C-alpha cells in the first residue's frame, strides 16, 4: 500500500496484523520503531520488497497472493494496473477531506467498516474523535487572532533541507484545529514545501513541532547539530518550546488511529493553561480501550510521547 498509515489502521481495526502480507518501507520503519510491532509482532513478517515509492513490482506482489490491495486514489495508473491484474483494488485518499485529519480517519474507518462489517467501528471512532475535536474547539475558539500562537511544523529536516507545511497539508489543519496559526500558511503549496532559515526568522514561530518524517529531536534544534543551520534566535528555541510529535501506531503528523490523541496533545502543548486538566497518558489509555478494546499500560502510553529516533527513517535498509 502506498498510503503509509494504512497498515497501522488495518492492524488496530482488526486488532491483528496477521492478514497484512505487504507494505511500503516507510510504513515498516514506523512499525518497527513504535508500539505497533509490540502489540502486533506479526506485522514485521510483512514484505516490503514489492513496492518502491509508488512503483509496484507486479510479479513480487503476485507472490504475496493478496485478497485485497489498498492503494492511493491519486495513483490512477497503479489502480488500473491492479484492476487489470485481477486484484480487488481499494482506493484510499489522504487528501480528499482537505487534510482534515479527524475527517480522514473517520472516513477511512467508515470504508473499512463497509468492507468488513463484522469489525464495524465507525460509530465508536467518529463519536470519540468528534467529541475530542469539539472539546478542543470549546477551549480555543475564543482566542483572538492577534493572540494565536504561531506554530512551525518541521516536516523533513537534513543538513541540506528544511521543509514545512504550506496552506494545503496536515500542518495547516492541525494549527487551525488547535486555535493556532501555521506560519507556513502563506505558502500556497500542496503538501510540504522547502524553506530557508531567513524565512523562519521572519516568521519567528512561538512553537516548533518536529514530525516523525525526520530523525531530529528538540535537542538537535537547541544545539544546532544538523548542518550549518542556526536556530538560536528563533522565539520557540529561546523559550524552549520545541517538541517532537508523538509516534503511536504510526507517525502522528498524518491522519491515523492516533489522530484524536494527537489533537489533544498539540492543543495542550500549545495552550497548557487551557488544557491543565487533560492527563494525556490517561486519555490515550481511555481512547484505545474504549474505542478499540486495546489495553495499554501507563508505560506504553507514555512511550507514544517519547518516540524513537529511528522511526524518522523512511526505509528499513
Locate each region found by the language model.
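Extracytoplasmic substrate-binding proteins
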Residues: 78-160, 185, 237-238, 244-316
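Extracellular/periplasmic catalytic domains that process cell-envelope and extracellular macromolecules
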Residues: 14-15, 62-63, 82-84, 143-147, ...
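A short, structured surface patch at a secondary-structure boundary
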Residues: 2-62, 68, 73, 183
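Structural recognition of the beta-strand scaffold that forms the well-ordered cores
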Residues: 1-2, 19-24, 68-72, 89-93, ...
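A contiguous binding-surface segment within folded domains or other stable secondary-structure elements
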Residues: 193-247
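Solvent-exposed loop/turn segments at secondary-structure junctions
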Residues: 4-7, 26-29, 68-70, 74-78, ...
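Alpha-helical, coiled-coil/dimerization segments enriched in small aliphatic residues
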Residues: 164-191
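Short acidic active-site motifs
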Residues: 56-57, 78, 195-199
Amino acid at each position: 500500500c502506498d498510503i503509509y498509515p494504512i497498515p497501522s489502521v488495518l492492524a488496530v481495526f482488526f486488532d491483528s496484523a496477521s492478514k497484512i502480507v505487504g507494505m511500503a518501507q516507510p510504513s515498516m520503519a514506523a512499525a518497527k520503531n513504535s508500539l505497533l510491532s509490540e502489540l502486533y509482532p506479526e506485522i514485521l513478517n510483512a514484505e516490503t520488497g514489492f513496492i518502491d515509492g509508488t512503483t509496484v513490482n507486479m510479479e513480487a506482489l503476485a507472490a504475496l497472493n493478496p485478497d485485497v490491495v489498498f492503494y492511493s486514489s491519486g495513483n490512477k495508473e497503479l489502480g488500473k494496473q491492479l484492476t487489470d491484474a485481477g486484484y480487488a483494488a481499494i482506493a484510499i485518499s489522504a487528501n480528499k477531506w482537505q487534510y482534515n485529519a479527524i475527517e480522514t480517519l473517520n472516513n477511512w474507518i467508515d470504508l473499512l467498516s463497509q468492507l468488513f462489517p463484522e469489525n464495524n467501528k465507525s460509530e465508536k471512532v467518529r463519536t470519540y474523535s468528534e467529541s475530542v475535536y469539539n472539546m478542543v474547539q470549546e477551549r480555543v475558539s475564543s482566542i483572538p487572532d492577534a493572540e494565536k500562537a504561531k506554530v512551525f511544523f518541521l516536516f523533513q529536516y537534513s543538513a541540506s533541507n528544511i521543509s514545512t507545511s504550506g496552506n494545503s497539508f496536515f500542518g495547516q489543519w492541525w494549527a487551525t484545529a488547535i486555535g493556532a496559526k501555521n506560519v507556513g500558511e502563506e505558502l500556497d503549496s500542496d503538501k510540504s514545501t522547502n524553506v530557508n532559515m531567513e524565512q523562519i526568522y521572519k516568521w519567528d514561530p512561538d512553537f516548533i513541532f518536529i514530525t516523525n518524517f525526520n530523525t531530529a529531536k528538540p535537542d538537535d534544534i537547541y544545539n544546532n547539530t544538523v548542518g550549518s543551520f542556526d536556530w538560536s534566535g528563533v522565539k520557540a528555541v529561546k523559550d524552549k518550546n520545541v517538541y517532537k510529535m508523538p509516534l503511536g501506531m504510526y507517525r502522528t503528523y498524518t491522519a491515523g488511529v492516533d489522530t484524536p490523541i494527537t489533537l489533544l496533545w498539540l492543543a495542550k502543548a500549545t495552550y497548557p493553561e487551557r488544557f491543565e486538566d487533560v492527563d494525556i497518558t490517561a486519555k490515550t489509555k481511555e481512547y484505545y480501550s474504549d474505542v478499540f478494546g486495546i489495553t495499554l499500560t501507563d508505560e506504553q502510553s507514555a512511550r507514544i510521547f517519547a518516540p524513537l529516533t529511528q522511526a524518522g527513517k523512511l526505509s528499513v535498509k
